[in-house]
Every structure is written in structure tokens, then in C-alpha cells.
């Protein structure tokens, strides 16, 4: 059987960079890791609660965390930041307060910045959310996959592969369905590939969505 390695970890240091940048003593490392998870969960929960879109998408591509001795810098890359910022300018401050309360950090300053990504549908996380929304609304999985591929074609990507696994369309036996458009060279380390795995809960059970997007060759 072919061994499947995570395409992001496989390319760390060449085409992929870390989403968390900080140093810690070996004994304190696990605390820092837990802190990162708390920050990410807190932000996602806040965005879910405050953004109401018809498709139920959060639109978060990734959250980068940089830590120094006296400062935690958080950059949220979003596909549709207007939905969070335009309603109330106070929202970012409120989010900052929430994260600070969650972390209970007294002697460190917290700074949150929101950056818009140029092609939202060229990002696998946002696409996976889109497909999840479609599947929850009982759209047929093939239709959802094809629509996702159409959206990425507008974002000038070189190739995409979408895979859905589980009880598709409520069938008794779980199966894996996939579709590929263009090139997706998973073995080439120089190829910049974005990847995301996403779990969606439907009325029939849990489905797994995996998306590989071939962005560019370095």
C-alpha cells in the first residue's frame, strides 16, 4: 500500500513555513503548544458565533502566531474579513479581550491583525468549508465537488484534487469518492501544494473532506 504523508509537513522548510513562530525551553514547550491551541480555538469559536453567512462559512484560511517575551502577535488570514470587521469596528477589540481572558496573560501584550487573502477560493480550508456547507444542505456530493473545482479555476490554480470519504448520500456502506482537475504532483517537493483535511457532521454521520491544491512550482 502507498504511504500517504501530509503534504504540508513534507514540504516544511522548502515551500511551506510554520504557522507558529516561538522558542521555548523543552519543559515549557507543551504549555506553549496548548496556548496556541487555545488561541486558535477561541478565535474560531468567536468567528463562528459572530458571522452568520448563508453557507455557514467562517472563511479563516490560517492563523499565524508569533510570540516574544512580552508580546503575542496573532495574524488571522481571512477570505472574507468584511464580514467580521464591517459590522462593528469594536469586534477586533472584543476578540482580543476574549483571547486575553482565555489565556489569562497579565504580563504579555496581545496584538491581533486581520489580513485578507487575495483569492479566497484558492485556499483549501475555505473550499472545504464551502463543500461542508453544501453537503449539510443535502446537495449531491458530485455537484458540490464540481462547484468547488469551478470556484478554484477562477483563482488561477494549476490543479486541484478533492476527496470525500464516509457514508456519502446516506448510503449504508462508507466509500471514498474523489475528483481531480489539472496536475497535482504530490511527490515533487518543489511543488507548492496547499492541503486541508476537514470533518463535517451530516445527518447520516461524519464525512471527511480532503483537498489538495497545486498552487505553483518554485
From Swiss-Prot:
Query: What GO MF terms are annotated?
Result: rRNA binding; structural constituent of ribosome
> A Gene Ontology biological process annotation?
translation
- One CC-aspect GO term: chloroplast
Record localization = Plastid, Chloroplast
| Domain KH type-2 span(s) in chain numbering | 47-118
What keywords is this UniProt entry annotated with? Chloroplast, Plastid, Ribonucleoprotein, Ribosomal protein, RNA-binding, rRNA-binding
- Bilayer-crossing regions: none
Main location as per UniProt: plastid
Q: Which SUPFAM superfamilies match?
A: Prokaryotic type KH domain (KH-domain type II), Ribosomal protein S3 C-terminal domain
Report the Pfam families cross-referenced here: Ribosomal_S3_C
Q: How does it assemble?
A: Part of the 30S ribosomal subunit.
Family assignment? Belongs to the universal ribosomal protein uS3 family.
| UniProt protein name | Small ribosomal subunit protein uS3c
Tell me the lineage of the source organism. Eukaryota, Viridiplantae, Streptophyta, Embryophyta, Tracheophyta
